[in-house]
Amino acid sequence: MIVRDYNKAKETDRRVVASQWESVRLLLKSDNMGFSFHITTIYEGAELPMEYKHHLESVYCLSGEGEVETLADGKIHPIRPGVIYILDHNDQHILRAKTEMQMACVFNPPLTGKEVHDSSGAYPLEAEAVTAD
C-alpha cells in the first residue's frame, strides 16, 4: 500500500511550480499504477493554452471558478467545484481561471514527476523523475 500526505509532499520535489500554476504530484510512473494523480493549483487570472499530445487527462475541480475552451469547436465550458472535464482525444484547449482553482488531475500514461508544458502546451512523454517518496 502507498500512503502519502499532501501537506508533506508539497514540501518536496513532488511540488512543481510554473508561472501560472503549481502541482503536487502524489502518484507517479514510478509507483507502477498505470496513471498519475496530482493536486494542481491554477493561479487567479491564468490563461493556459494546452494540448497533451502524449497523455489523456481528467480534471476534477475541487475549488475555484474558471472555464475551459475546446479549440476544435470554440465551445466554452464553465468550471466550478464538482465539475470534471476529460481530455479523451488529446484535445487542444485553453483553461482560464477566474479565481484560484484547485484541481485533482489524473494522467495516462503517468507523469514521471517534473514535467512542465513545452511551447506547444504539451508535456513531454518522459521527464526527470522526482526523488522524494
UniProtKB/Swiss-Prot annotation:
GO terms for molecular function: ectoine synthase activity. CDD domains: cupin_EctC. It catalyses: (2S)-4-acetamido-2-aminobutanoate = L-ectoine + H2O. It comes from the Bacteria. Keywords: Lyase. Pfam families: Ectoine_synth. Pathway: Amine and polyamine biosynthesis; ectoine biosynthesis; L-ectoine from L-aspartate 4-semialdehyde: step 3/3. Signal peptide: none annotated. GO terms for biological process: ectoine biosynthetic process. It is an enzyme of class 4 (lyase). Its EC number is 4.2.1.108. Catalyzes the circularization of gamma-N-acetyl-alpha,gamma-diaminobutyric acid (ADABA) to ectoine (1,4,5,6-tetrahydro-2-methyl-4-pyrimidine carboxylic acid), which is an excellent osmoprotectant. Belongs to the ectoine synthase family. This is L-ectoine synthase. The lineage of its organism: Bacteria, Pseudomonadati, Pseudomonadota, Gammaproteobacteria, Chromatiales.
